[in-house]
Amino acid sequence: MQMKTLGVSELNNYIKNVIDNDFILKNSKIKGEISNFKIHISGHIYFSLKDKNSKINCIMFRSYARGLKFIPENGDNVILKGRVSVYQKDGAYQFYCEDIEKEGVGDLFIAFEALKKKLYNEGLFDEYNKKEIPRFAKKIGVITSPTGAAVKDIINVSKRRNKGVELLIYPALVQGENAPKDLINGINYFSNRDDIDTIIIARGGGSIEELWAFNNEDLAYAIYNCNKPVISGVGHETDFTICDFVSDRRAPTPSAAAEIGVFNLNEVNTNIENYKNRLYNLIRNTINLKFKELNSLENAIKINSPMNTIANEYIRIDNLKNKLCHKIESKIEYEKIKLSKANSLLNAHNPLNILSRGFSIIKDEKNNVITTKEKIEENTCINITLKDGSTKVRISDVYK
């Protein structure tokens, strides 16, 4: 098989896609010593992170740099949280930093990464195992501290979005040695209630030690095996816990978790009104269209109606009758003229008319017309027809 030849840009783009889609590299923590630290005029931070044998170039964009709790310096031993990607123009990979904390929690970081890898390999983070968050939840179970800022944020957001959604608060410790047990009990409690639609597990931001209860392995299994969909709203946007990975939906803050879990009644009412208007317009347009079709059918029926055909035939018959009558009258008149001419001609040649002018018709006893005197003999009888009658005479003498 012939090997495909790649352009430099194609190769860099391919490597970038591979790295960007790697589960570990797209959400990682690394530790080392800061060097070449520089804050750019744009607000972005550029530096290197090194250990005894290696170093990697790092960048922290201004949006993340604003959230730093301290300004790092060259020589600081720190833990970076972020992702690895490739700057395509140079073909160089670098670490895109989202948070910086001073080293001292190295053991916790190692334990976090080990547990994350274990649960990932067991399939607890797989997307196809995650349950869908109900769009119109009526009752939501909230597991958090009853006195913290998180519960206040969740209640305020819920009231603003939909006062009809009921929140059931399960009071739990959210940090400390006994916190995981409380959180697990809360998950199990709401999991077994038929009236609960969604569960929110939440707390405000804090250090890795303060959020460590949400990295508990037993809590991860409890969330994974929960009968209800779970929304994790732990810490701030840059904080990630095992709870975030295993939950059905991760929210960057407790307020955002409430935004996801509680549907906005005003938006729903607006959507319903829009759907009503769309449905009304659709029905109205359909009715108008059907009326047009009906009118077209009525016109077609009128055009093709048998009554129209019959009426047209009556008109045609009347026209034919008038033509026939006209032809008959013309024929009669023509025949009258011919008859008159024939009568005139007949009258002109009628022997009786000739007799009126003094002529007569002479026939012998056998009724033969006598036209010459040679046919007349003495002492015979002849018939003479005159204008007003006929007479029989005897011939006494014939003049030769």
Curated annotation (Swiss-Prot):
GO terms for molecular function: exodeoxyribonuclease VII activity; nucleic acid binding. Its main location: cytoplasm. Its EC number is 3.1.11.6. It holds the Pfam family Exonuc_VII_L. InterPro entries: Exonuc_VII_L, Exonuc_VII_lsu_C, OB-fold_nuc-bd_dom. GO terms for cellular component: cytoplasm; exodeoxyribonuclease VII complex. GO terms for biological process: DNA catabolic process. It is found in: Cytoplasm. It catalyses: Exonucleolytic cleavage in either 5'- to 3'- or 3'- to 5'-direction to yield nucleoside 5'-phosphates. Keywords: Cytoplasm, Exonuclease, Hydrolase, Nuclease. It is an enzyme of class 3 (hydrolase). Bidirectionally degrades single-stranded DNA into large acid-insoluble oligonucleotides, which are then degraded further into small acid-soluble oligonucleotides. Heterooligomer composed of large and small subunits. Belongs to the XseA family. This is Exodeoxyribonuclease 7 large subunit.
